[in-house]
Regions:
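Extended, well-folded interaction surfaces typified by the phenylalanyl-tRNA synthetase beta subunit core
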Residues: 12-14, 18, 22, 26, ...
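Short beta-strand-to-loop capping motifs
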Residues: 13, 73-79, 122-128, 180-184
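Ordered, soluble secondary-structure elements with a strong preference for glycine-centered loop motifs
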Residues: 21-25, 78-83, 130, 134, ...
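Short, charge-patterned binding micro-sites
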Residues: 44-75
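Ordered, amphipathic secondary-structure segments that act as subunit-interaction surfaces
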Residues: 67-121
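Short amphipathic alpha-helices in soluble, non-transmembrane regions
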Residues: 84-92, 133-144, 195
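Core RNA-modification/binding signature centered on pseudouridine synthases
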Residues: 142-237
């Protein structure tokens, strides 16, 4: 008898509010439980200790919020995008909600292997008194025009000067803060707080990571000139 392959889905979700302090492993466990509670027909690995066949795209550092997180999952059967979203969201708090579910082609690569960029919104942390955003915005045009942005990159064994400018794809004023589109993924990866630190140095203001909130807007695949959201890999069903 021919074995039927599992269906591959990609799920987009939010991580907001106080759940920004929940780590990646806890988020994985959270979704494993949510999938069970929603009674979705997820696939399990073979062997003595079966686990759900899900994998996450680009783990987020503690303290960041997002409306553009993704994970992939294999399922034995599916209903519809709307039904599966509703069943998952009914099991979860408002801070974590599924925004979209798409079906992937059989030959689709895992999301973690195709991430190339992410964009972010940087704004004042309302829980802190310091507000250096106006100074950063004033210095932003000059910063955006720089050909080179060097930072001291620390490793376990040494410190070295690194030019991060090629990894800053776009940076501009956005709402009451800063928008930045940065390289992200296994090939090139630039943390947004490093850019904020470089901006502070350029503007001549002290850098304190806790003065700012960092919110991921979307996670992308493709080359710099032709970026697409990870949700463009498939179709709703």
């Amino acid at each position: 008898m021919e074995e039927v392959s599992a269906l591959k889905l990609r799920i987009k979700y939010t991580k907001l509010g106080s759940l920004r302090f929940i780590g990646h492993l806890d988020i994985m466990r959270f979704f494993q439980k949510a999938i069970r509670r929603a009674k979705l027909d997820v696939s399990y690995s073979k062997g003595f200790s079966p686990h759900q066949m899900i994998s996450f795209a680009a783990p987020m550092p503690l303290g960041m919020t997002s409306e553009g997180e993704y994970f992939d999952g294999e399922f034995e059967s599916v209903t519809t995008t709307e039904d599966m979203m509703a069943r998952l969201n009914a099991t979860m708090p408002p801070e974590i909600q599924v925004l979209d579910i798409i079906e992937l082609p059989d030959n689709a690569k895992p999301s973690m292997a195709i991430v190339t960029a992410s964009d972010y919104y940087i704004y004042k942390n309302e829980e802190c008194e310091n507000d250096t955003i106006p100074q950063l915005l004033q210095a932003l045009p000059a910063f955006a025009e720089k050909d080179k942005v060097e930072i001291v990159k620390k490793t376990k064994s040494k410190e070295e000067l690194t030019d991060i400018r090629p990894l800053i794809y776009e940076i501009k004023e956005y709402k009451d803060g800063v928008y930045m589109l940065l390289a992200s993924g296994s090939r090139d990866n630039l943390k947004p707080e490093l850019v904020v630190e470089a901006m502070c140095e350029s503007a001549g203001v002290p850098f304190n990571r806790y003065d700012y909130r960092i919110h991921r807007l979307e996670t992308y695949m493709g080359e710099k000139e032709e970026l697409q959201p990870l949700s463009a890999s498939g179709t709703r069903f």
